[in-house]
Amino acid sequence: MEELLKELSKRAEEEILKAKSLQEIESLRVKYLGKKGELTQILRGMGSLSPEERPVIGQLANDVREKIENMILERREKIAKEEKERKIKEEYIDITMPGKPYKYGHKHPITLVMDEIKRIFLGLGFSIAEGPEVELAYYNFEALNTPEDHPARDLQDTFYITSDILLRTQTSPVQVRTMEKTKPPIRVISPGRVYRSDDIDATHSPVFHQMEGLVVDEGITMGDLKGVLNVFAKKFFGEQTKTKFRPHFFPFTEPSAEMDVSCFACGGKGCRVCGYTGWIEILGAGMVHPNVLRMSGIDPEKYTGFAFGLGIDRIAMLKYGIEDLRLLFENDMRFIEQF
């Protein structure tokens, strides 16, 4: 039995040293030390030994078991370390190498135009004011000098939520909210979404974007309005741009006007873009109606002001030569990636 134990110890040592994986080590542990392992089978035969042999063989068997256990433990630790080092080497990242560039998104044409207009007016001393898109009918109509029998208040033109709550049809309500909270002098612009009950086609949408402008102070005149809008037109469309004001009607301004700019496509000579007139309409404006000032808590005898509103979507279409408004909202990457 002594020879069997020595031969088993030698064979186990050779096999353990040759093991290349943790799975092989576990198999060898079961082979030699498991319940049905070779060492266990040898030990079961100790009952046939004489009383003198049992202590000697028992001690030798324990030494062999301890040796095999230690060798398995050492080999397991070494293999685990080697596998860890190999894995680290395989997954090594050279932090000195340049990273892969991210594919960044870019701004939508409406956002590009809105940001450019904001920069111009912020440079002229304006600040940005905001208001709710779900608005009270009072701010959308009454406070803007729009009587109850005005056509704009019809259900066919306005999205009503209740009889006195609606989706704002213009950014003008921000004027009133600003004047209620702020004492003159006031110089604000208010960009945002507005809603009207229009059928979708190449030039109409039930959701579009406007930007409102408001100035209120002592001694404000129509000349101030023209001066500010002339500066805007030249900065946005180019220094060569000319402007033209035409009389118009808005219930919340008096006098009122629409402003045209010389066609930037043909320089005012006449082309398809401007309808061969040489001019393109871009916004409506006027002096704030005394009733609007009064309803906002501002004395019209002391203060005057001007307001203007422009359609961001329309200006974006003009600037980029877009002929169909629907392209701005269809999320067609072939179109959007051009900007």
UniProtKB/Swiss-Prot annotation:
Its EC number is 6.1.1.20. It is found in: Cytoplasm. Pfam families: Phe_tRNA-synt_N, tRNA-synt_2d. NCBIfam families: pheS. It catalyses: tRNA(Phe) + L-phenylalanine + ATP = L-phenylalanyl-tRNA(Phe) + AMP + diphosphate + H(+). Its cofactor is Mg(2+). Mg(2+) binds at residue 254. GO terms for biological process: phenylalanyl-tRNA aminoacylation. Binds 2 magnesium ions per tetramer. Belongs to the class-II aminoacyl-tRNA synthetase family. Phe-tRNA synthetase alpha subunit type 1 subfamily. This is Phenylalanine--tRNA ligase alpha subunit. The gene is pheS.
